[in-house]
Amino acid sequence: MKFVLLLLIVSFAALQAKASSAIIINLAAQQLYLYQNSKLVFVTKLSTGRKHLPTPRGTYQITEKDVSHTSSIYHVPMPYFMRLDGEAFGIHYGYNPGYPASHGCIRVGSMSEARTLFRLTPHGTSVIID
């Protein structure tokens, strides 16, 4: 656990050297942290991918933002959608039961928090998922 925390800190420091905004998603805690200019400015609870459809770990960038996105796979609304590296998953408003339950996306359970996160997060923001 200490190694994972150290890795996140080192990765975050490297990303901060390149960008003024970064998101860290802690899968174990089901939490999202938004940093701007090395300061924590936003925290929210999440629901990430369930056991057989996990949210992929790694480092990504926000490459697309859509206020009123509809999934082309599941044909459901995904308000305040932010796609990661052109992949078929992203961060968006959605049902949050308090545990991993999605098909891989990162769900923010409050519409107002999803809106705030969307507004605070520019294209190109780095996202670390671990």
Question: Each PLM stretch: what is its role?
Answer:
Residues 19-20, 50-59, 66-130:
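Exported/periplasmic cell-wall-interacting domains
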Residues 3-13:
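Sec-dependent N-terminal signal peptides
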Residues 2-3, 18:
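Protein maturation boundaries and topogenic segments
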Residues 15-61, 126-130:
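Intrinsically disordered, low-complexity
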Residues 1-2, 24, 119:
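Structural motif
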